[in-house]
């Protein structure tokens, strides 16, 4: 995961007219000893990248949260499938082991919002 991928994911979902100018980035350090489950592309439903039908993906995420098998789930990015997003489950007991950096303010280059 990277800040640049997070920004891309943000931009495809935000109403650009309502995008705040005072964003922050908070890095997370996940200990090597912490279980990180991974969803491979082959495990995802057909058409998983299509924005029109996200229900199967939402169901997958909800089932992961309910199962409480890990605090972190690594999933392919729909925008750049060779890169990954990390979903965090704050209800999992291992979530407290994740170390958080201080928030770092940043703003988007105005060209992103044109």
Q: For each predicted feature, which ranges?
A:
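Long, hydrophobic N-terminal alpha-helical segment
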Residues: 1-22
